[in-house]
């Protein structure tokens, strides 16, 4: 069988807390795009083999994303699509702030843009260098595990890397309103899109920034917080469609 490759912008896939490039393996199997122009990346601080990983910062993560954009040849004439899951929204919001012209479209996967001044865990004790993946019972209180088998959860536990403390404590400082003009796809999984928009209009801290976006598409993909494992084929289709959009 011959696989048809879709023409699209370059694509960068960035998973959230505790995850690396490996989290996108199932999606990549279904993403019929040019593999030379599609990169699943591991953010600094989430490489288990990095002896300095607990000291990595948001600045390190932003620099790494910009480096991948450069390697893909992203430019104002040929910008890339960035797919950001969950807690990857901090560094990706900063990338949109500093180089919006390099981004064709941002796809937030059960995630969204952060507001300036926000931090994921500002009260994290100074003596805590990193935050390991919590127990599944606690994790389920924080995010939906719907659609994840025992096998998938075991793999998550085995491969998860503790999140570096500096990344969790640092506030995200944004100054460039041009970030809001980047075309955006909001993939709503654990909370329906209509509810997300209502929360945004009500000024909910987690979603308020959504109301400032100039070009927004909302896609409902009902499942848990990790759709790259529970609905990889469907998520791949959403990503492929977003990357191929011309406006």
Task: List the model feature ranges, each with a label.
Residues 97-98, 102-103, 107-142, 202-203:
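Flexible "cap/lid" loop of the alpha/beta hydrolase fold
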Residues 18-26, 38:
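Serine-hydrolase catalytic-loop signature spanning alpha/beta hydrolases and amidase-signature enzymes
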Residues 158-177:
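Active-site nucleophile elbow and catalytic-triad environment of alpha/beta-hydrolase enzymes
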Residues 43-81, 97, 121-126:
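Active-site loop/oxyanion-hole signature of alpha/beta-hydrolase fold enzymes
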Residues 28-52:
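Conserved alpha/beta-hydrolase
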Residues 83-92:
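Gly/Ala-rich beta-loop-alpha elbow adjacent to hydrolase catalytic centers
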Residues 193-222, 234-242:
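Conserved loop-alpha-helix segment in the C-terminal half of the alpha/beta-hydrolase fold
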Residues 16-19, 86:
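Active-site glycine-rich loops that stabilize anionic/oxyanionic intermediates
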């Amino acid at each position: 069988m011959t696989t048809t490759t879709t023409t699209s912008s370059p694509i960068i896939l960035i998973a959230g807390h505790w995850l690396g490039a490996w989290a996108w393996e199932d999606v990549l199997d279904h993403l019929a795009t040019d593999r030379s122009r599609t990169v699943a990346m591991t953010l600094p601080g989430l490489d288990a083999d990095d002896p300095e990983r607990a000291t990595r910062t948001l600045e390190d993560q932003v620099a790494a994303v910009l480096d991948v954009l450069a390697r893909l040849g992203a430019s104002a004439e040929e910008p890339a699509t960035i797919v950001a899951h969950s807690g990857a929204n901090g560094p990706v919001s900063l990338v949109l702030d500093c180089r919006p012209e390099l981004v064709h479209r941002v796809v937030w996967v059960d995630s969204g843009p952060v507001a300036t001044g926000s931090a994921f865990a500002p009260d994290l004790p100074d003596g805590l260098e990193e935050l390991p993946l919590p127990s599944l019972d606690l994790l389920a209180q924080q995010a939906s595990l719907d659609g994840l088998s025992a096998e998938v959860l075991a793999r998550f536990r085995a491969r998860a890397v503790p999140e570096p403390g500096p990344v969790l404590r640092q506030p995200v400082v944004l100054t460039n309103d041009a970030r809001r003009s980047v075309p955006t796809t909001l993939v709503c999984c654990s909370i329906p899109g209509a509810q997300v928009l209502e929360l945004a209009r009500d000024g909910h801290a987690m979603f308020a920034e959504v109301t400032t976006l100039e070009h927004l598409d909302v896609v409902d993909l009902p499942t848990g917080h990790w759709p790259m494992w529970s609905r990889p084929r469907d998520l791949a289709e959403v990503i492929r469609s977003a990357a191929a959009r011309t406006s």
